[in-house]
C-alpha cells in the first residue's frame, strides 16, 4: 500500500494556515456586508455561512479540504468528507448537497487511489442523507481532498459560535488527539490500536450529536478543528463577550495521546495555535505540557456546545442513553481579562 501520509508536508487540519496568518489575510475582507439576507458571514469566524432564500428557509454553505492523515485512500476520503459535513452540523443545519474537491498528483499516483478516496467521501455523504452533485479536480504535486457542502436550516434555528451565555455549561462530544496521532502515523511511531481508535472518531459524523444539540436548545456551538479546543474556545468567548472556563482534568483524550506527546510527536500546527492563543488563556501554575493536546489541530473533531444547566443535564443523560459520547468540560462565565480560563 502506498503511504499517503508520506507524500504531504502536514496531515489533515494541521496543514491549514495558522490562526495568525489567516487573520492577517482576512483582515481586509471580514465583515458581514449589507445584504440583509446574509444571516451569518465571516465576522465571528463561524463554522459556515448562512444565507436566507425564503420565508423560514436558509442555505448553509461551507467548504473544507485536507491533506491525508491516514494511509488508506477510502478511509482518508471518508474522514475528509466527515470533516467537511461537520460545519453544517455545527450550525444546526441539514446537509443536502456536496461537491468533490480533489487535488491529485496524477504523475506519481495511480488513478485508482483517487477513485477510492472519492468512494470514501461518497460513503459519508450518503450516510448524511445528502447528494453528491459534482466536483472539481486540479492536478497538483500534493494530494488534497474535501467537499463543498450546502445545507438547509430554518433562520430561527441557527446555532452560532458567538451566542454563549454566562451560566451555561460546556460540553464536548469527541475526545482530542487526532493531530498528534496523525503526526505519529506519518512517522511510523504509533501502535495500530491507537490508530484504529483515532480513525473511528474521525470517521464518525457529528449528525447525532447535532440532532441532540437541537433537541436540548443549545445556546452556541462550534466544531473543534484546526485551531484546537482552546483556539475554538477563544473564538466562542470573544464572539459572545464572555469567558469560558475549562476544567483541564475533565478534557477527554484519545488513547495513547499523552505518550505520543511525551515522545515529541506533536504537529507544527499545535505550536502555531499555542503561540497565537496563549495570550488569551489564563493557565493555572503547573499545567505545562498538559495543555499541548488542547492546542492540537483536530480533523473531524467533536462539537463544543454550550447549554443551560438544565438542558446540559438532559443532553448528557440522553447522550448516554443513545450511546453517544459527551463530556462536560467546563462552563461560561461573565467576561474576565482572558477569553478562556483553565481550571
UniProtKB/Swiss-Prot annotation:
User: Can you quote a single GO CC term?
Assistant: cytoplasm
> Which parts of the sequence bind ATP?
16, 44-46, 64, 87, 135-137
Q: Where is the signal peptide?
A: none
Q: Name one Pfam family in it.
A: AIRS_C
Provide this UniProt record's keywords sorted from A to Z.
ATP-binding, Kinase, Magnesium, Metal-binding, Nucleotide-binding, Selenium, Selenocysteine, Transferase
Q: Where does Mg(2+) bind?
A: 47, 87, 223
Listed EC numbers? 2.7.9.3
Enzyme category, top tier: transferase
Metal-binding keyword on record = yes
In this protein, the active site sits at: 13
Query: Is the keyword Nucleotide-binding assigned to this protein?
Result: yes
Co-factor note (free text): Binds 1 Mg(2+) ion per monomer.
GO BP annotations of the record are: selenocysteine biosynthetic process
Q: Mind telling me which InterPro entries this protein's record contains?
A: PurM-like_C_dom, PurM-like_C_sf, PurM-like_N, PurM-like_N_sf, SelD_I, SPS/SelD
Under Gene Ontology molecular function, one entry of this record is: magnesium ion binding
Q: Which reaction does it catalyse?
A: hydrogenselenide + ATP + H2O = selenophosphate + AMP + phosphate + 2 H(+)
Q: Where is this site: Important for catalytic activity?
A: 16
What top-level branch of life does the organism fall under? Bacteria
Query: Which co-factors does it depend on?
Result: Mg(2+)
UniProt-listed NCBIfam families: PRK00943.1, selD
The role this protein plays is: Synthesizes selenophosphate from selenide and ATP.
State the family it belongs to: Belongs to the selenophosphate synthase 1 family. Class I subfamily.
Question: What is annotated about its quaternary structure and interactions?
Answer: Homodimer.
Stated name of the protein: Selenide, water dikinase
Q: Which organism is it from?
A: Geobacter metallireducens (strain ATCC 53774 / DSM 7210 / GS-15)
Q: What is the lineage of its organism?
A: Bacteria, Pseudomonadati, Thermodesulfobacteriota, Desulfuromonadia, Geobacterales
Amino acid at each position: 500500500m502506498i503511504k499517503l501520509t508520506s507524500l504531504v508536508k502536514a496531515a489533515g487540519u494541521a496543514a491549514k494556515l495558522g490562526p495568525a496568518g489567516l487573520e492577517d489575510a482576512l483582515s481586509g475582507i471580514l465583515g458581514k456586508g449589507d445584504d440583509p439576507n446574509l444571516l451569518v458571514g465571516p465576522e465571528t469566524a463561524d463554522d459556515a455561512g448562512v444565507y436566507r432564500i425564503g420565508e423560514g428557509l436558509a442555505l448553509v454553505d461551507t467548504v473544507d479540504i485536507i491533506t491525508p492523515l491516514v494511509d488508506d485512500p477510502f478511509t482518508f476520503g471518508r474522514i475528509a468528507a466527515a470533516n467537511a459535513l461537520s460545519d453544517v452540523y455545527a450550525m444546526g443545519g441539514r446537509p443536502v448537497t456536496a461537491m468533490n474537491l480533489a487535488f491529485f498528483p496524477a504523475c506519481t499516483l495511480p488513478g485508482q487511489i483517487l477513485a477510492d478516496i472519492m468512494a470514501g467521501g461518497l460513503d459519508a455523504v450518503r450516510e448524511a442523507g445528502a447528494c453528491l452533485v459534482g466536483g472539481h479536480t486540479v492536478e497538483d504535486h500534493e494530494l488534497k481532498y474535501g467537499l463543498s457542502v450546502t445545507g438547509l436550516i430554518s433562520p430561527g434555528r441557527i446555532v452560532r459560535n458567538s451566542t454563549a451565555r454566562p451560566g451555561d455549561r460546556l460540553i464536548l462530544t469527541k475526545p482530542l488527539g487526532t493531530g498528534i496521532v496523525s503526526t505519529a502515523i506519518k512517522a511510523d511511531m504509533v501502535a495500530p490500536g491507537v490508530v484504529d481508535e483515532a480513525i473511528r472518531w474521525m470517521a464518525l459524523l457529528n449528525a447525532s450529536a447535532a440532532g441532540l444539540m437541537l433537541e436540548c436548545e443549545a445556546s452556541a456551538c462550534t466544531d473543534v478543528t484546526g485551531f484546537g479546543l482552546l483556539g475554538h474556545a477563544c473564538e466562542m468567548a470573544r464572539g459572545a463577550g464572555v469567558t469560558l472556563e475549562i476544567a483541564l482534568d475533565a478534557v477527554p483524550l484519545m488513547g495513547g495521546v499523552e505518550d505520543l506527546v511525551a515522545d515529541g510527536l506533536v504537529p507544527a500546527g499545535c505550536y502555531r495555535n499555542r503561540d497565537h492563543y496563549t495570550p488569551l488563556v489564563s493557565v493555572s501554575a503547573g499545567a505545562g505540557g498538559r495543555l499541548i493536546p488542547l492546542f492540537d489541530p483536530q480533523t473531524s473533531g467533536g462539537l463544543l456546545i454550550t447549554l443551560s444547566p438544565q438542558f446540559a443535564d438532559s443532553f448528557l443523560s440522553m447522550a448516554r442513553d443513545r450511546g453517544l459520547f459527551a463530556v462536560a468540560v467546563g462552563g461560561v462565565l461573565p467576561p474576565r481579562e482572558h477569553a478562556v480560563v483553565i481550571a
